[in-house]
């Protein structure tokens, strides 16, 4: 069975694992999911990630971060979706919770946080936001 929105599936798995207080979560891997996990790690929302399993069907294992028993990710939500893509120019990139959160942007130079995209002067598709 094909999946219509693998990014939403990834975000839901991370959200559910946090609610269940799991140490890590596994999901099917892809280049875009690895890039999103890299941004989450750079911004301090997850401990790390690694690819495990066979070469034909790799699995992405994300190690979640907790601070004093509370999840590092309070909210994680899909912004642009397959039925309604959302693109923003460099001057229109969203600020999540007045700069306390992070938007993850897919640009022509790769996947990056909203702060990096603003600093480099890039716009792109707003994939999701994290707080």
From Swiss-Prot:
One of its GO terms (cellular component) is ribonucleoprotein complex. GO terms for biological process: translation. Keywords: Ribonucleoprotein, Ribosomal protein, RNA-binding, rRNA-binding. InterPro entries: Ribosomal_uS8, Ribosomal_uS8_CS, Ribosomal_uS8_sf. The keyword ATP-binding does not apply. Coiled coil: none annotated. Pfam families: Ribosomal_S8. Part of the 30S ribosomal subunit. Contacts proteins S5 and S12. One of the primary rRNA binding proteins, it binds directly to 16S rRNA central domain where it helps coordinate assembly of the platform of the 30S subunit. This is Small ribosomal subunit protein uS8. It comes from Halorhodospira halophila (strain DSM 244 / SL1) (Ectothiorhodospira halophila (strain DSM 244 / SL1)). The gene is rpsH.
């Amino acid at each position: 069975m094909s999946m219509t929105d693998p990014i939403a599936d990834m975000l839901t798995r991370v959200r559910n694992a946090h609610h269940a207080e799991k140490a890590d979560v596994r999901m099917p891997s892809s280049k875009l999911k690895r890039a999103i996990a890299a941004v989450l790690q750079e911004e301090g929302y997850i401990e790390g990630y690694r690819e495990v399993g066979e070469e034909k069907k790799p699995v992405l294992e994300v190690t979640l971060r907790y601070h004093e028993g509370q999840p590092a990710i309070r909210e994680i939500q899909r912004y642009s979706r397959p039925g309604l893509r959302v693109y923003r120019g460099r001057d229109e990139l969203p600020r999540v919770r007045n700069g306390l959160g992070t938007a993850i942007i897919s640009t022509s130079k790769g996947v990056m946080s909203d702060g990096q995209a603003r600093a480099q002067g890039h716009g792109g598709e707003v994939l999701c936001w994290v707080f």
